[in-house]
Amino acid sequence: MKFEELNLKDLILITPQVFADNRGFFLETYNREVFKKGGIDVEFIQDNHSCSSAGVIRGLHFQLAPYTQGKLIRATQGSILDVVVDLRKHSSTYKGVAKVLLDSKDKKMLYVPEGFAHGFVSLESCEVQYKCTNLYNKSAESGIRWDDPELNIDWEIKNP
């Protein structure tokens, strides 16, 4: 696996090694020791799976402390534009925005650490799976509007 830090501190794009032949493919999506060596030393305790029609925006979601969540995100069908915002007030990239294309064809994954808001737009019908470092907690649920004027995010679709 290849681990690449992106424009926001601690945001990591992961490119897995895919073994493909005429029968199909195999890849390892998570290995605690490999991730630890790649700079991601967390414990995932919940897996989620969502399905969205083309053009759907989900997010920007986050949970308040002490229920913050880190996430490992991948598109298992279709493609998404994944959008994250750094909400860590003491971070050098505070309020920074990153956009990453995740596609079921290239199988890249995105690690979003605790302290970020997360969302995505489905560029086609898609399924997205993500691992979380904390359980969902309804009382800690929060979010930022997708069209927040301060962030001014271009979701790269017509009529969001």
What residue ranges belong to the model's regions?
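Non-catalytic, conserved peripheral segments adjacent to functional cores
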Residues: 1-106, 130-160
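Conserved metal-binding segment of the jelly-roll/cupin
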Residues: 102-124
